[in-house]
From Swiss-Prot:
Belongs to the UPF0473 family. InterPro entries: UPF0473. This is UPF0473 protein CPE1618.
Amino acid sequence: MEEKQIMAFRDEEGNKVEFEVVAKIYLGEKNKKEYIVLSPVEGNGDEADDFVFRVDKVNDSVEYNLVEDDEEFRLVKKEYKKLLY
């Protein structure tokens, strides 16, 4: 059984919120971009509660940036649904 990968972030009020990485998605043919789909650990399991982050490599570190562009978000969710069904 695969171990769950948990990530923690702070919300607007500074509270720690934990998320499970439910999928890693790679888009693009030449320069593949990596994305992760996160689901709240304390959530109800509803896919609508999922968040999509782009994994950006900056210098020698990794940044997780929330995908806010509608088209980019739609493409990632489309690939995620392919994994589910």
